[in-house]
Amino acid sequence: MNESDALPDFNRIWAARVAASPSPRMHDDGIERAFWRDFISRKVYKPESSARQVLAYLRPLLREHQIETALEFGPGWGSYTLDLAALCREVACVDLSQDVLDFVLRAGRERVFCNLRAFHSKWEDFSPERTYDLVFGYNCFYRQGDLADCLARMTRTANKLCVAGMNVAVLPPWLQEMKDVGASANWDWKDPVYFV
């Protein structure tokens, strides 16, 4: 790539995709909270297999950087949270859903983790009282209208390391079959290239 090659404005592209989403969850905090309340009420703590793979890669990195404190935003059902609690002296979670926070804290207590804290807030509105060795967000960026600000917040809040990740699902075989017959399908509307 030449210096004169213009890079796309990832933040503008990302914001346009978030704004164009037909899902009311993207734009209405009450609907998002209701979704998580319903989802968490049926959930049992069990980390996803993909989280195991990510953590196998991250554990040595976290040890190498001597991570003792972590802040995770958007913990979902805690696929990463309790592993972070096992590795760190303290883990703080930030989420707009109190139901999510209660679920993660309960799962932690059931596994005798006493080093978890929770902050009921949207990441965009959260004002941390201190910094953390690690700021961690995984699969939680879907509502971030200003991704550049989100990443800048992570950087300001981290002393040593930021981890921002997003799983990219494997395309189902029927999607290619649809394309082969001329059908239109929008599977990957947030291109991870703009996220990296």
Residue ranges and their predicted role:
Residues 148-162:
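A short glycine-rich, Lys/Arg-flanked "PGG" loop and its adjoining helix->strand segment in the class I
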